[in-house]
């Protein structure tokens, strides 16, 4: 079982000193991966329900600091040697896949093969409206983007011709260090996300769900993978959870190999104490 930290670019971690301490201490204490989140803007008085809180609102309110998800990972890459650098999640249909493919390949090269691209299709309609994008075609654009990026990460020139994206032949360098390209982990806890992970994902990351719900989603993912002629066992399963040994082992029993948690504190001393406690009381026992 691997343990990751979520929200490493948001709130107080937009401070470079605190982010640097979080990254280096997390690596020293055995944290496997660091995950960033994304919203390019948060429209005032939005009505779309945030799916990960009972209030339906983003924690921290509309004024919460959410830096770009990729630049902090590049910052972390320069300070660390082995911790994985992940987006959790990047809102893929808000970006052109040519740019995402270039950025992720660059991050993978600079970090010597440590990048993970966690992607979501988005929930905040007003954010799509602000960008001039059609919220209702986000699923189709997400699917095309995954296929387009994989084409760009292949050797030589590449082309893609879809309804939403059309290019090529073009060349795009550098290529990712990781063979086969940067791993793409599909986020979300909907049936559509589970099916997308089964068809296209290197990983599936439903951030919410008790074990019965996760088992249901994993079943949907596995059935879709088999339908697509893929081996479901090749798709890595991650989720968010609590850093308790019994809880982690229960998740491991249903196939989860990574659990991502919130940072244990938001100050230097608290992070040091909290991460060392995780190392001694949790990581050492899983």
Regions picked out by a protein language model, each given a short descriptive name:
Residues 1-286:
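Active-site-adjacent structural elements that line small-molecule/cofactor binding pockets in enzymes
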């Amino acid at each position: 079982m691997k343990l990751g930290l979520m929200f490493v670019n948001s709130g107080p971690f937009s401070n470079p000193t605190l982010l640097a301490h979080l990254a280096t201490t997390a690596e020293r204490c055995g944290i496997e991966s660091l995950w960033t989140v994304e919203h390019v803007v948060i429209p005032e008085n939005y009505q779309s329900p945030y799916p990960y809180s009972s209030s339906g609102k983003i924690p921290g309110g509309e004024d919460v600091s959410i830096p770009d998800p990729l630049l902090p990972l590049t910052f972390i890459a320069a300070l660390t040697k082995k911790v994985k650098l992940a987006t959790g999640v990047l809102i893929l249909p808000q970006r052109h896949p040519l740019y995402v493919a270039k950025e992720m390949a660059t991050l993978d090269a600079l970090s010597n093969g440590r990048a993970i691209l966690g992607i979501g299709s988005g929930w905040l309609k007003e954010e799509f409206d602000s960008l001039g994008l059609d919220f209702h075609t986000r699923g189709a654009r997400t699917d095309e983007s995954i296929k387009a990026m994989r084409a760009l990460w292949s050797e030589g020139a590449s082309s893609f011709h879809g309804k939403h994206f059309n290019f090529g032949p073009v060349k795009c360098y550098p290529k990712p260090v990781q063979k086969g390209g940067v791993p793409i982990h599909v986020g979300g806890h909907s049936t559509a996300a589970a099916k997308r992970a089964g068809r296209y994902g290197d990983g599936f990351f439903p951030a919410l769900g008790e074990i019965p719900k996760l088992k249901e989603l994993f079943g949907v993912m596995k059935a879709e993978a088999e339908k697509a002629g893929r081996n479901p066992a090749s798709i890595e399963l991650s989720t968010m959870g609590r850093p308790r040994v019994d809880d982690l082992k229960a998740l491991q029993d249903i196939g989860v190999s990574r659990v991502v948690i919130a940072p244990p504190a938001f100050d230097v001393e608290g992070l040091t104490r909290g991460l060392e406690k995780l190392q001694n009381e949790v990581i050492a026992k899983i």
